[in-house]
A protein has these predicted regions:
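C-terminal beta-signal and adjacent terminal beta-strands/loops
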Residues: 285, 330, 398-418, 427-435, ...
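Surface-exposed extracellular loop regions of Gram-negative outer-membrane beta-barrel proteins
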Residues: 1-2, 10-72, 132-135, 148-197, 202, 205-262, ...
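Signature of Gram-negative outer-membrane beta-barrel scaffolds
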Residues: 52, 78-219, 346
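Outer-membrane beta-barrel transmembrane strands
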Residues: 1-7, 49-94, 140-169, 203-207, ...
Length: 500
């Protein structure tokens, strides 16, 4: 701040105003002597922190075992196979890093304290409360809030067969496996005393995949490749539970994911041009997703669990390189795709303060775009490979068709209930119905980001030492045009103010 003030007082003020007011946090914490009889007896004049810095832990213990075998057969045939085993245990917990001037943290669920009359209901560690008569007193380095473990067992056996003759190549591979996962709650949550501590339901899945690869080389300059695959994968632990920090409840409708993928590629390799043209098609079915956020309409922290999410990806990709003069080449790439949702997933909504489903509906996502990835990208540049292992390049990049990650609640019947009532009303005027229809379109419209372009350049050199070692140096400058308004992704707000 001193540096900015020397440069410009207005900038310094802006920087300071944008910072968190840690002075206020320290003063508030140091002056907060809790008058609760239990805390007064336990802690005396020690100050209770209302503000602090936490450190969220994801501590993994991961064991892997792999066995591979290979057999070369006659007539250019080879078979490779093996088996894999993975055992993973991950500890999830939050730890106090800094109490910001206070002496301790009283570990209770403040949202539950607001809504629940019973002291037991807002305990983060109910067993500790039963044993001591008060909530956990946490200091720097102590766990607080939540503590649970994720257990994962994965095993599979696989095989890969390849054969080639002349310009033709064939590859066939497959695997079959088993996946098991469950949650182990280390603390008993006061809101969910019977569904938070101990092991959850064991989730078991059969996994498999089958792949076929074909290739044919017409000549040294022309070749084609084709691949097709179908696989079934177990869902991720993060989407298997509606609120793993608080309880063992699994996501309703949870299924294994099914993936189909196919692609076709043509390769061109001539002295005056090198090119690669590919087309692809992929479908994903039965994905699941859990979004946790503060629901301002319910004044509670909520979990939005979706299942039956289907997606479709298809498109083309082109890459080329054209040498023009003494190591200088024109290079380019083009990628166009259409990534869309193809189903209306089911969802259930739960809140952390109630042990029941508060809302059940469908999300109208069919036809909307999959978020974040550019569905149109273009690159053209110059690439130079000089003597003595010098290299340099300059590239122009263009991106378009990038979409915002959607709030699923906006695409439910519940969110537009007020407007649909207007549309079906016999007393509403045409103007009111037109306004309601416009509001529905505004609510459900998916935001598309503006197109963007960047310019980058690089230069470098490699040194080979005794033909054994390589030492390299490279320098790259990206976004030379200093465009600071590029948006590559983001999330639609989860608050329902857009409805209002």
């Amino acid at each position: 701040t001193i540096y900015f003030y020397a440069m410009d007082g207005a900038i310094a003020k802006g920087v300071w105003d944008g910072m968190l007011d840690y002075d206020k946090f320290f003063q508030t914490n140091m002056r907060n002597i809790d008058t609760d009889p239990v805390l007064s007896k336990l802690m005396g004049n020690n100050s209770r922190s209302n503000y602090m810095i936490e450190e969220r832990h994801t501590d993994q213990l991961d064991y892997n075992l792999a066995v591979n075998v290979q057999h070369n057969m006659r007539h250019n045939m080879r078979i490779v196979g093996g088996a894999n085993l993975r055992v993973n245990r991950t500890n999830y917990y939050s730890e106090i890093k800094d109490l910001l001037g206070g002496d301790y943290w009283y570990d209770i669920d403040k949202f539950a304290e607001r809504d629940m009359a019973s002291a037991e209901a807002y305990q983060n560690d109910l067993d500790y409360y039963w044993a001591t008569g008060h909530a956990r007193i946490a200091r720097v380095g102590d766990k607080y809030g939540y503590y649970y473990r994720a257990h994962l067992l994965e095993t599979n056996a696989w095989a890969n067969y390849t054969w080639g003759i002349g310009g033709f190549s064939l590859g066939v591979s497959g695997s079959v496996g088993y996946s098991n996962m469950y949650r182990e709650g280390m603390w008993r949550k006061g809101l969910f005393p019977n569904d938070s501590k101990g092991d959850s339901k064991k989730l078991d899945y059969l996994t498999y995949d089958a792949k076929l690869a074909l290739g044919y080389k017409f000549s040294g300059a022309h070749s084609i490749e084709a691949n097709v695959a179908y696989m079934q994968q177990a869902p991720k632990f993060a989407t298997a539970f509606v609120s793993p920090r608080t309880r063992n409840t699994t996501t309703p409708g949870l299924k294994a994911e099914k993936i189909f993928a196919a692609d076709l590629t043509y390769n061109l390799n001539l002295p005056y041009i090198k090119a690669r043209l590919s087309g692809y098609y992929t479908t994903i079915e039965d994905q699941s997703k859990v979004i946790s956020f503060y629901d301002d309409t319910r004044s509670s922290f909520t979990n939005f669990a979706m299942s039956g999410i289907d997606k479709r990806y298809y498109g083309v990709e082109l890459g080329l390189s054209v040498p023009v003069w003494n190591g200088l080449s024109v290079v380019g790439a083009l990628s166009w795709g259409d990534y869309t949702y193809t189903s209306n997933p089911n969802f259930v909504q739960t809140v952390d303060n109630v042990d029941k489903i508060v809302l059940k509906d469908k999300v109208n996502w069919d036809g909307y775009h999959v978020e974040s990835s550019p569905q149109l990208a273009f690159n053209i540049g110059l690439d130079y490979r000089g003597p003595r292992n010098w290299f340099a390049g300059v590239n122009f990049n263009y991106y378009d068709n990038i979409y915002l990650s959607m709030n699923p609640m906006y695409r439910t019947a519940t969110a537009i209930k007020y407007y649909t009532n207007v549309l079906t009303s016999n007393t509403a005027t045409n103007a009111q119905k037109a306004s309601a229809l416009s509001s529905i379109k505004t609510l459900r419209k998916q935001e598309k980001f503006d197109s963007a372009y960047t310019l980058s350049a690089n230069i470098g050199k490699n040194w080979y030492i005794h033909r054994v070692y390589m030492l390299g140096f490279s320098l790259e400058v990206k976004n030379i045009l200093n465009d600071q308004d590029i948006r590559t992704g983001g999330y639609e707000q989860m608050r329902m103010s857009k409805v209002r």
